[in-house]
Amino acid sequence: MTLRLFDTESRTMREFAPLVPGRASVYLCGATVQGEPHIGHVRSGVAFDVLRRWLQAHDYDVWFIRNVTDIDDKILNKAAEAGRPWWEWAATYERAFDRAYRLLGVQPPSAEPRATGHITQMVELMRRLIERGHAYASAGNVYFDVQSYPEYGALSGHKLDDVHQGESAGEGKRDPRDFTLWKAAKPGEPSWPSPWGPGRPGWHLECSAMAEFYLGAEFDIHCGGMDLVFPHHENEIAQSKAAGDGFARYWLHNGWVTMGGEKMSKSLGNVLSVPNMLTKVRAVELRFYLGSAHYRSMLEYSDKALDDAVAGYQRIEAFLHRTAERVGEIPVGKWTDAFAEAMDDDLAVPRALAEVFRLVTEGNKALEAGAVDTARELGGQVRAMLGILGVCPFDPQWDHKQDDSVAQTALDVLVRAELDRRQQARADKDWATADAVRDRLHAAGIDVTDTPNGPEWSLRTARGKAN
């Protein structure tokens, strides 16, 4: 069966046919690094890591780009409120996201570009748009002329008359529906030079420029959360295609993590941070939970749903460990046809997991009957399927010191809370409190080092330091 994916733009299931045979190019909208990652943030990372693994299983050479938005109004505002440099704030939470992805077993991207590292490409894209009559400069700002692009709204289904960009009218806008490509410099804010005056890029411009730079004018798959369909992805399409690029050929969007039927969001105060979740369950169990629903479905969080997922994973894990105790090493086998059919059907993970549990049931029966060869074969198949989902307990990511990993994560949460108090005290010039926090951590065996990217901590041992 050929891999089929649901394409948001055409609203149909389409067979995946890459632009270049044997190669798959994928762009995932990454984090705006404004704060601690919560499980709603990282669901897309887990979901599209499964896509990447399945493409690799189809023998594609996958070039996977996940960007970092490290300049944004929210970053500037939160850094200013905390009295910290914007770049330090962004770097701190970029590391927090990297740590969360790493703990959840998400494969590192082929490249992870920062927006601030690609201003040159953004300026060039704006120049092309202005030359083609699709953008205009006004009072140091640059705007995209939405009416100049008749196909606007094709991705989201929005009619032009109904468009609201969710941004201010803007100085010099010809039409309130036009969106910002370049924001003129303001006192106290970072800026970069451009032919239209100093300023900084708009969010939509960043992704178009980075996707083209790393993947080319046309590439295979663009991924992201469903909340990005409009305006972000709609605007990406408009500016890239208006500039003459083919841009993405398939659009994939994952559903939200919800609580009480509402999207998990810091503005609603209903977030569950990744570090705090990892004090309750192991990282592999959290990944299993986040990846257990179909990627396009909403994932309604509840303690019971999490507990059920953990119990399900532990059932699989127990079968594999019992089998290994009886037969020794379990070689990785080949997934079943039913598993492959499910994954080829728009990554139907719930059906794929049903096949995993079917084999676990058969395997447990084989163990009870003393049919160890059958159990070994079934265990190998289960290992292969869990490997695609990124949760095989025997994989190096998970097969060492899981309890130590949970304890380390819990300690990191507590220490970073203290470091945040210290940073706030320093911003307030409350040196006594800042020193007291540092001394308290030192007495507990924790050394703090101030770096250009913010404070780092290490645990002191009898022989020295160990991160």
From Swiss-Prot:
Keywords: Aminoacyl-tRNA synthetase, ATP-binding, Cytoplasm, Ligase, Metal-binding, Nucleotide-binding, Protein biosynthesis, Zinc. GO terms for biological process: cysteinyl-tRNA aminoacylation. A motif ('KMSKS' region) lies at residues 263-267. ATP binds at K266. One of its GO terms (molecular function) is cysteine-tRNA ligase activity. Zn(2+) binds at C29, C207, H232, E236. Binds 1 zinc ion per subunit. Its EC number is 6.1.1.16. Residues 446-467 are annotated as: Disordered. A motif ('HIGH' region) lies at residues 31-41. Monomer. This is Cysteine--tRNA ligase. It comes from Nocardia farcinica (strain IFM 10152).
